[in-house]
Amino acid sequence: MDNQINEVTIVGGGTAGWLTAAFLVRFMNLRNKDNPTKVTLIESPNVPTIGVGEATVPTMPALLKSLGISEKEFFIRCNASFKLGVRFTNWNHDDKGRATSFIHPFEAIRTQLGGQNPAYHFHKYGGPQGRKNLDDCMAFCGSAIRAKLGPKLLTHGDYESKLNYAYHLDAGKFAEFLREVSIERGVNHVLDDVEEVEQDERGFISALKLQRQGRRPVELVIDCTGFKGVIINKVLGVPFRDYSKYLLNNRALAVQIPHQDVRQIEPCTNSTALGAGWVWRVPLYNRIGTGYVFSSHFRTDDEAREEFLNHLGDEVKDADPRVIPIRIGRMERAWEKNCIAIGLSAGFIEPLESTAIYMIDNFVKLLLLNFPDKSFAPVLAKRFNETTEKMMQTIRDFIILHYCTNNREDSDYWRTAREEMVIPDSLKDLLEEYRHTLPINTDFDGVYLFNYFSYNVVLFAKGYLKDVQYPAERFIAREDWDKRMAEFIRYEQKELAGLPNHYELLRKIRGEDDIPAQHSGASFGGFNAAAFGAQPGGIQIPQATVQIGAGQIKPSIKFALKKDKKQETEVDQDDLSGSHIL
């Protein structure tokens, strides 16, 4: 009896479904043309994808390259732009009550200094004038972002660059692009509705009954049906592990707005904190995607809409943001019997750090590494589930970090996020470690995306460590740090020299001509004076600031729920366009 799985059936489209299809059809059959595995994707023609997510992380270029996708064509088809990092504004306040700002960059100089982590030097001596954050002293991205530079030279080809980068993209167009690529490479596309799911005596999925095409036997099923989790949750009964005790937000407003001047397009995502959540701003080539992620415990939909539109001000006229309910958490097991959940059906962590496509990518790679035969050895599912659980937990912890280290006193939302939400033991232990030493990657149990530098950037920018006295700082010298900073600035100038304006680079990639972008300020090696440490203007909020200490975190939550009737309406969706916003 043939024990080999001959067909993989994906249920659901969107970014999750089509990225899975594109990955499987390429890597299962690229070296196996004589005995290819059939890939079928079934999606409903009646349930539209809710397109929200429009940003990625710096693993994305390698993913597209591995899929054999032309980067130039991707930019044109998806109205993509470059992303060099995320700017966080108003998540904390300084000692005068003013909003602070920092950038989480995509690269860093990680060499030691005098046998020690150079972050100790920054902690003890601070940065040079105009470089008040750690990212200004160990990464070039902030300078490039402030000067609105692209990461490539005009002469660079696909996937070549001087700086690490990710993309902003139109999620709907990206899913369409992946669909075309997948079908061209042999994916069988079925437009139909799944009406019934059959199970055998073991509880395995044996067949899908389609509305128009009838019964369809299956061997291995990939559930990409979004928040509904049609197969993994509703049929197989895998429980959902709710993260609401850790993270408050459960709603989002989304709207598209035009560029005021496309020539000034920023190569970064912006995350600006408001009274009950935060606003994302993702600049595509042809428009800006923006929205408000908030908590219904502190704002009704109407209140959030008013706050959001007031924040946007003159940029919006007669805008009607759509409301998107979001469910934060994960399935207890992403692999159950002969079904594997990928995308929203597996789980969704608040989209603050653009991690959804990254998770889809890693889930599919793990499937290929643990690909079963028809016996479905339990050890494979066990390994897959343990690894994906750890991956999602590490992302969850890093998202929580942004909230539990805030020092805002101007709203109940921010006080609750800091003082009453549960902090996982894994993050508690790490924060306690940071009170005594600055960890390195070996201290992180399974580094997936956010390593010690990411944690350092956030904790230093928020002032969480400013009162800590590190024993290791006895062994460092100011002269070493001053020399390193002088070398760093010279190296930064060299690396950024010749990099074009972001808009001009996008026009070059797309093969278009237009008026050159307007540059302002003095030029240093091809980029503006603003690149040298000048901080973007923050939101001035006259509020008191409190110092956050580890002892102030409380593992409980008590607040009154605030609802309106509109919040009871569910939005039907197969996917959330890759389930990422940032």
What do the predicted segments below correspond to?
Residues P48-A144:
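Dinucleotide-binding Rossmann-like beta1-alpha1 core, especially the glycine-rich loop
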Residues G157-Y159, L163-G277, P283-G291, S295-A304:
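Predominantly flavin-linked oxidoreductase catalytic cores and closely associated redox partners
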Residues F532, P536-L582:
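Long, low-complexity, intrinsically disordered segments
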Residues L369-G521:
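Long, low-complexity C-terminal extensions of enzymes
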Residues A273-P325, S345-Y358, N370-D373:
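Conserved FAD/dinucleotide-binding core of flavoprotein oxidoreductases
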Residues I324-A341:
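FAD-binding beta-loop-beta segment adjacent to the flavin cofactor pocket
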Residues E7-D34:
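N-terminal Rossmann-like FAD-binding beta1-loop-alpha1 element of flavoenzymes
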Residues F27-V52:
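Glycine-rich FAD pyrophosphate-binding loop
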